[in-house]
Amino acid sequence: MEASRGPPRVKNKAPAPQQISAEQLLREAVDRQEPALQAPTQRFADLEELHEYQGRKRKEFEDYVRRNRISMNNWMRYAQWELEQKEFRRARSVFERALDVDPTAVVLWIRYIEAEMKTRNINHARNLLDRAVTIYSRVDKLWYKYVYMEEMLGNIPGTRQVFERWMSWEPDEGAWGAYIKLEKRYNEFDRVRAIFERFTVVHPEPKNWIKWARFEEEYGTSDMVREVYGLAIETLGEDFMDEKLFIAYARYEAKLKEFERARAIYKYALDRLPRAKSVALHKAYTTFEKQFGDREGVEDVILSKRRVQYEEQIKENPKNYDIWFDFVRLEESSGDVERVRDVYERAIAQMPPSQEKRHWRRYIYLWIFYALWEELEAKDMERAHQIYQECIRLIPHKKFTFAKIWLMKAQFEIRQMDLQAARKTLGHAIGACPKDKLFKGYIDLERQLFEFVRCRKLFEKQIEWSPSNCQAWIKFAELERGLDDIDRARAIYELGISQPVLDMPELLWKSYIDFEEYEGEYDRTRALYERLLEKTNHVKVWINFARFEINIPEGEEEDEDEEEKPVSEEAKRRARMVFERAHKVFKEKEMKEERVALLNAWKSFEQTHGSPDDIAKIERQMPSKVKKRRKLDDDRYEEYLDYMFPADDESSAKLSQILQMAHKWKKEQASKASKET
């Protein structure tokens, strides 16, 4: 049974001695294919049997069309069978009956017409087509069938007559194109021109004018082509003017080496067409200038095209500073100093609509780029200085300021070898609108000049202005530390951590602790940790405290390589004491998340430095996750994950056991007292 389940397995996977090709398999399959069933051939002995068979089939077809009159397939099968029996009159009768049922069936008309054409009844077919196009003058398929039949019969005048009847209904472009192709096949070019004249009146789209011009280009003269294009431009007017027409006209003139004519056509069109409708025209003009113009002409075309584009966008929204940026970059690439200045002056004249800093952020960069361009490209230092001064005067410093512009002006003054002006600029900035970025830039400048006394004064001013800025305290202390004034750095740190409000106190404490640890003042570091733990019980502080205790070298090991020195038992003991203190605090305050993080760090410590017993002791304290439910304010319940600590369960179990024993003792005492009484 087991062997019969599933697909058969091939145990021997070696190649067969005789290989079989796909061709052999296909040939064998075809040879063995059984012949399809064929209907027996009916033979009629005399006319009576034939008439009896025909009568029976007609009765079947009549039943079909009677049951479902609107199905044209039944009618067409009936008529086709009559045609096979050479009963043309009966077939016509069937077709006519079908047309009485549904005279709008175009497929039925086509079948009827094709049947007459196949049986060479041309007049019948012509009469049918005439009926059809008279009733359904908007059905192009009938007209196409009509003109095709007349042309195949060699009746070209009749074909023209049919086309003229058709064109009187003003059909779509395909019908006109078929008429034009007919006349071209028989080299009747004057007739083609007359058809094009009528065609462009009915369908005056630019592409049809271009078709006419290309016909004249192939069979006419250059004057005729120009006449067609001129007539098209005059007929369409400025309202319906299209860039494709001008592109085709200009390319024709360029083909004839009439470059000035082509350039004039492009410029004529560009002056009259709006930007939105002349994208391809601009591109074609650029390509033309690249091919047949000089370099200046090409660059002028590109610049003028983009200038027009930017001017239109600025006209729509003059406060869009991104467009001004692109515009000035364009003019800078042209190298025309006066144009660049003009665009910059127009740009900075577009002041923001309100005195909100978010509106000024992009605008201020126009001034910055203007000043940099005057300094670096135009080499006009006096003008650059005036731009900085005007920009600073323009900013409403009582509401907001931009430290970048003050710092850039100071750097500009330094590049001009005027240090006093740079200091005056930054001093003015700090006095008018102090910012951390301004203090930082000014201090960095003085540090680069090795003016450390000035740096101290600036740090003092910054701390006086913003005593809650931890970065200022840290940088100030690092400056003193870099100058080897440890006591001064320590005093700065002490002042910093004593501030009642700090933006990021954890950074300041960490920097102070790292400073003391780097200096080897381990007692001071330990005292700092203790002071910090009085302010916060964050789990990271406890973990870092324990790690600090591990990394304290013993007296004789201080000079050894830090990677090679072993951790002493005393250091391990101190670290464990820190972990135990932290665990006790978190346990008492029921801080479960912090307690879990601490136990994980403690476990990692024991795995690195402890014994198997120590590791097992910690693992016994590791909690397990349990799902609990709590009630919400809207009387709904939600599930949450909680931690269950084995140590807590053991202590509560011991406590409950003691309570049971006390309760039992109390009962015994009560029973003894009742017996004595």
Curated annotation (Swiss-Prot):
Quaternary data: Associated with the spliceosome.
Pfam families xrefs: HAT_PRP39_C, HAT_Syf1_CNRKL1_C, HAT_Syf1_CNRKL1_N
SUPFAM superfamilies attached to this UniProt entry: TPR-like (SSF48452)
Cellular component annotations (GO), alphabetically ordered: post-mRNA release spliceosomal complex; precatalytic spliceosome; Prp19 complex; U2-type catalytic step 2 spliceosome
HAT-type repeats, residues: 52-84, 86-118, 120-152, 154-185, 187-218, 220-255, 257-291, 301-333, 335-369, 379-415, 417-448, 450-482, 484-518, 520-551, 570-608, 613-646
Record-level GO BP terms: spliceosomal complex assembly
Record keyword Cytoplasm present: no
Species classification: Eukaryota, Fungi, Dikarya, Ascomycota, Pezizomycotina
Stated role: Involved in pre-mRNA splicing and cell cycle progression. Required for the spliceosome assembly and initiation of the DNA replication.
Name this polypeptide is given: Pre-mRNA-splicing factor CLF1
Intrachain disulfide bonds: none
Keyword terms of this UniProt record: mRNA processing, mRNA splicing, Nucleus, Repeat, Spliceosome
Gene name as annotated: CLF1
Subcellular location: Nucleus
Family under the similarity heading: Belongs to the crooked-neck family.
